[in-house]
Swiss-Prot record:
GO terms for biological process: base-excision repair. The keyword S-adenosyl-L-methionine does not apply. One of its GO terms (molecular function) is deoxyribonuclease IV (phage-T4-induced) activity. This is Probable endonuclease 4. It comes from Mycoplasma genitalium (strain ATCC 33530 / DSM 19775 / NCTC 10195 / G37) (Mycoplasmoides genitalium). Belongs to the AP endonuclease 2 family. NCBIfam families: nfo (TIGR00587). Keywords: DNA damage, DNA repair, Endonuclease, Hydrolase, Metal-binding, Nuclease, Zinc. Its EC number is 3.1.21.2. The gene is nfo. Binds 3 Zn(2+) ions. InterPro entries: AP_endonuc_2, AP_endonuc_F2_Zn_BS, Xyl_isomerase-like_sf, Xyl_isomerase-like_TIM-brl.
Amino acid sequence: MPKLLGSFISFKAPNYFVQSAQDAIAIDATALMVFLGPPHSAYRVPFNKMQFSLGYELLKTKNINSNGLVVHAPYIINCASKDPLKQQNAISVLTNEIQLCNLAGAHYLVLHPGSAVAQTTNEALDNLVKVLNQVINKTKTTVICLETMAGKGNEIGRDLTELKYVIDRIVDKDRIGVCLDTCHFHDSGIDFSDLTGVFNTITTKLGFEFLKVIHLNESKNNCGSKKDRHANINAGMIGFENLMKFISHPQIKDLPIILETPSTSLNYPTIYREEISQIRSWFKTYQPDAN
């Protein structure tokens, strides 16, 4: 049974983390992921308005602590940009985000690696390395988790070898890791019907020691589509059984496992409670020795 299982959770005015905590409790989560502000903006309210202390008091009643908190960095920064001004902006935004993570007690910050705009993939990867080393040097504790990407357009991070290239060049290895998104992994061409192959890919191209967070998502598209279109659990092309067996792996089941499946204003957060219940029900009957 996954120890840290939850979903994307809303974080917004007026109650911020208090409302996030209430939503997490309502869906019976043991983990949660939030953006500390609008996902497509670097704007953040002062930390003292985010109500983390009160939120943690609520979470404590359900034995949830900061080990289950994951923060997602804003989408607007491209840490792989060749533009010096955009690099400096990325450093500034990411540094501020990690400082907020430190105050919030968040161990992991998920980051999209960026795009190779008007440059080669290797040049973009080198720019990402440069930015990350500077940010890590300015900050402490929180681990930056590079998210695996589906391969749309100029995205970097569509292959674990690219992310390992970056990790190998980060000075402080304790501050860098990977967030594996199952929809992105599938859409990039990894076939979850061959779990032995999936685990071998992780072992040979990355190493399980760098796997820190799982985004548990279904996909609306075929393997290798490079589309990045999430589907709800048990309603996609990867297969519920394949996803469950994937997260049952001994080196995965204890990581924060976060659902980012589709929700609307009409079914949030109830849809996540239903999916978490489905996952736990599967684990209650799973017999690994029989498979």
